Amino acid sequence: KVFFEERFEDGWENRWVKKD
């Protein structure tokens, strides 16, 4: 499952695509 995280405060690395 792939989803985008809208966490700009955490930084770009965390905002990139995360694979679950």
Swiss-Prot record:
Domain of life: Eukaryota
Keyword check for Ligase: no
Subcellular locations according to the entry: Endoplasmic reticulum lumen
GO cellular component, one term: endoplasmic reticulum lumen
Post-translational modification comment from the UniProt entry: Glycosylated.
Keywords: Calcium, Chaperone, Endoplasmic reticulum, Glycoprotein, Lectin, Metal-binding, Zinc
Keyword Zinc: yes
GO terms, molecular function: carbohydrate binding; metal ion binding
Main location: endoplasmic reticulum
General function of this protein: Molecular calcium-binding chaperone promoting folding, oligomeric assembly and quality control in the ER via the calreticulin/calnexin cycle. This lectin may interact transiently with almost all of the monoglucosylated glycoproteins that are synthesized in the ER.
Record family assignment: Belongs to the calreticulin family.
The protein's name: Calreticulin
Annotated source species: Spinacia oleracea
